[in-house]
A protein has these predicted regions:
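Aromatic- and charge-enriched surface segment that lines or borders ligand/interaction sites
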Residues: 76-129, 161
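Surface-exposed binding/hinge segments that line
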Residues: 109, 114-116, 123-193
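Cleavable N-terminal signal peptides
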Residues: 11-12, 23
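N-terminal lobe/hinge region of extracytoplasmic solute-binding protein
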Residues: 31-82, 120, 127
């Protein structure tokens, strides 16, 4: 018995010693059943793209893990008008953007500009990023967002007002889906200038 305890203690000490020598990873390694087409769920409707992008991006609202219950995401709260046609999103403060890709160094946190960028690129034909996919955003269109949206406005840096042409019962669940991923407008602006 004493020998077993001694061996166990030695093993535990060795494991602890190995743990303190951890090295900062330089590359993210992700295992998937296939290669994603890209990391922009707005452009694709495949599981490999969604699976690769989900750990990287968030939506305004999201599904609670393993359910279809809508919970706060990048919007910490929201209010739906009595007629169901206006949704006011209060955005989470202090959310940081990723850096390093194409030497991008964000100068600001997530805000309403990113929400407008992410939806308008799919919705507005005159948006500079709309044509990237040939103007086709199948998921966005399949959720009938182009015909449902009346306007999307920035009230202030942390408030976005979405107006619908008519009330839509599943709108919050729909916004939890992958096409609703929010991306950095600042990063997109940097790419346009490159």
């Amino acid at each position: 018995m004493k020998r077993t305890l001694t061996t166990g203690a030695a093993t535990l000490l060795a494991m602890l010693a190995l743990g303190v020598t951890a090295v900062q990873a330089k590359t993210l390694v992700y295992c998937s059943e296939g290669s994603p087409e890209n990391f922009t769920p707005a452009l694709n409707t495949t599981g490999t793209t969604f699976d690769a992008a989900r750990p990287v991006y968030n939506q305004l609202v999201e599904f609670a893990r393993g359910t279809t219950t809508v919970v706060p995401g990048l919007a910490e709260k929201w209010e739906v008008s009595a007629d169901g046609k206006t949704i006011t999103f209060n955005l989470r403060k202090g959310v940081k953007w990723h850096s390093g890709v194409n030497n991008f160094k964000p100068t600001r946190d997530f805000n309403a500009d990113d929400v407008l960028f992410s939806f308008n690129r799919q919705w507005k034909e005159d948006h500079p990023y709309h044509k990237i996919s040939g103007g086709k955003y199948d998921y966005f269109a399949d959720m009938e967002m182009p015909t449902l949206l009346e306007s999307l406005e920035k009230k202030d840096d942390y408030t976005v007002v979405m107006k619908l042409k008519e009330a839509n019962a599943p709108i919050m669940a729909n916004l939890s889906m992958d096409f609703g991923t929010i991306q950095s407008a600042e990063y997109a602006d940097m790419l346009l200038k490159a």
